[in-house]
Amino acid sequence: MNTLVIQSFRNQNIPPWIQRCLDSVRVWCEVQGYQRCFVGDEIFDLVPDWYMDKTGKGPVATDFARLVLIRETLNNQGFDQAIWLDADVYVLDPNMTLDCPGSCAFGQEVWVQQAKAGTGKLEARKNVHNAVCLFRRGCVVLPFLMETVLSIIRRANPDKIAPQMVGPKLLSALHSLHDFDLLPQVGAISPDVARDIIAGGGPALALLQKESVIPVQALNLCASLISSEMNNAEADQLIAGLPLLICH
């Protein structure tokens, strides 16, 4: 299937660990025979001015812009399939395949966190995420999703727009009604899991492995987490330890 993989990040001052993620996707595309497109900050030119005035440059604007890029890829560039991968997704296994029986699919994460402050107990929640999005030509979900995102932001109070409002939170709500095809091989790591990976193991990592439907082959490293809690050396340690996730 003629496939384009789309990614976006700023063109300058790319953190070394983000570059490693981008390189892992490039290798994966070469192995799979996919074409790849990288878009810089010009991605925000695809978002209506009124939308940008409300959200600014950030994940909420990117959530809509990625849908515009995917629509353009399928409608006007001759591709049968478009796959979006966030810039902070690291592909562990270049032989990973993304497939689904329907016309679209989204990622599924097992998010491990403290069950209640002070208890020391962990819980794992399965969530839908859009760090990976797969759409095929003729998909009816794509235009519906675009219109839904615009409608939500148009009516939203600018002071109460949450980062995941039209991304994971919207998809999780729609999934309960639509039952999307999911791609659990592209997961995500929480702060607790990240700390265990750097340490070489721990209860959060063990719980993630236990609750994963299939071994993860790619991971959203959550740039906001790394930027706020880790320096570049720790980010390198995290990436070096990721193979722990497929050794169970």
Language model features with spans:
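N-terminal anchoring/stem segment of glycosyltransferases
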Residues: 1-62, 77, 136-140, 156-159, ...
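Alpha-helical context
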Residues: 4-5, 49-50, 67, 121, ...
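A structural signal for short, well-ordered beta-strand segments and their strand-loop junctions
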Residues: 36-39, 81-86, 105-107, 182-187
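Short, Lys/Arg-enriched charge-dense amphipathic segments
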Residues: 57-69, 104-112, 180-191, 203-218
